[in-house]
Every structure is written in structure tokens, then in C-alpha cells.
From Swiss-Prot:
It comes from the Bacteria. Catalyzes the formation of 6,7-dimethyl-8-ribityllumazine by condensation of 5-amino-6-(D-ribitylamino)uracil with 3,4-dihydroxy-2-butanone 4-phosphate. This is the penultimate step in the biosynthesis of riboflavin. This is 6,7-dimethyl-8-ribityllumazine synthase. Keywords: Riboflavin biosynthesis, Transferase. Belongs to the DMRL synthase family. SUPFAM superfamilies: Lumazine synthase. GO terms for cellular component: cytosol; riboflavin synthase complex. Forms an icosahedral capsid composed of 60 subunits, arranged as a dodecamer of pentamers. 5-amino-6-(D-ribitylamino)uracil binds at residues 21, 55-57, 79-81, 112. Pathway: Cofactor biosynthesis; riboflavin biosynthesis; riboflavin from 2-hydroxy-3-oxobutyl phosphate and 5-amino-6-(D-ribitylamino)uracil: step 1/2. It catalyses: (2S)-2-hydroxy-3-oxobutyl phosphate + 5-amino-6-(D-ribitylamino)uracil = 6,7-dimethyl-8-(1-D-ribityl)lumazine + phosphate + 2 H2O + H(+). GO terms for molecular function: 6,7-dimethyl-8-ribityllumazine synthase activity.
Amino acid sequence: MNFEGKLIGKELKVVIVVSRFNDFITGRLLEGAKDTLIRHDVNEDNIDVAFVPGAFEIPLVAKKLASSGNYDAVITLGCVIRGATSHFDYVCNEVAKGVSKVNDQTNVPVIFGILTTESIEQAVERAGTKAGNKGAEAAVSAIEMANLLKSIKA
């Protein structure tokens, strides 16, 4: 038997957890995610957005929303850009671990759409220019994973 997630968003309920920090990037990621969800037939009324101060706060809010039973998928969006200190490494590691842990604890797909870049230029490239829009890519993954899990439960 093969299990496969279809890219049809009809009847899915999705929440996006997005960081306000580096909002000139995360705003573009959010636009890309919402546009992609709608293009794949997710009803706009079935897309909720939760804003958090920074990337570090994403896992806690993602867990609360995933545990609510109200959503088929959670998309996490943020942008951490390397600076002159080791803060970047700590934040990136903990956020990645936190999002992964939410997947394990809730059985709701929590998609990692958090940019971890070496420069502002790299972030801009991944927010809708040269390297596509990682928010849009996260939305496609959310639809596929939500439908895949539904097919396994059936």
C-alpha cells in the first residue's frame, strides 16, 4: 500500500505562526504562504495567523495551536540572520529542536519555514526573489503532510 499526500487544500484548516522580528522578510514569507494556500483551494476563512515576537517564541505557540485540535497543519515562519555573536547558533538550534518536538508531541504536521541565513541578502533571496519563497514552499508541505496524515488515519 502506498500513502501519498495530495496537494488539494479544500476543507483544510491551517494556522501560520510568524515572527515579527525581521518583518521585512517574514512579511514576504507570510504573503507567499497565504497565497499558496489559497491557490491550492484552502478557504481564506480557514487560514489563521498568530504573530510572535521572535523565532524563539514560535515553538511554544505552535504547540498550543497544534494541541488545540482546531488545525490540520501548522506553518512556522521566521527569519534568523547571523550576527557578530553566537546568539544565532543558540536560537537556530533551539527553534529547530522545538518545532521538531511539537511534531512528535502533537501528531499535527508543523512545517519548518524559518530562514536561518548568513546575511540579509540570503534572506531576501529566499523570501520571494532568486531562491523562491520559502513561505510558499512551507505551505505546499503543510497541505501535503495534512492530507498524508489523513490518508494514514483512514
